[in-house]
């Protein structure tokens, strides 16, 4: 029984570790923060330093996922990932006057 549990634990740990490799290769970050992303270097590192997320040449304000890019507001790659982005919300509604105008 102990050997089966050890095999199961090691399989799950290995699968979890290998599952982060595509994320690191594509986005330049992974849940464990291993290694450097493809945008490390002159753009400032990580997905936020890449051309699409605030680095040269776009500086975060242009298509496709710039500063206010929807749904990736502020250039965070994973919508809703805690600690990196704000919770999802629609475009801000115009402010309403506090008193009724006649």
Curated annotation (Swiss-Prot):
Highest taxon listed in the record's lineage: Bacteria
Keyword terms, alphabetized: Signal
Residues spanning the signal sequence: 1-25
Subunit architecture: The protein envelope of the sulfur globules is composed of the three different proteins CV1, CV2 and CV3.
Family indicated by similarity: To T.roseopersicina TR2.
Function: Structural protein of the sulfur globules, which are intracellular globules that serve for sulfur storage in purple sulfur bacteria.
Entry protein name: Sulfur globule protein CV3
The encoding gene: sgpC
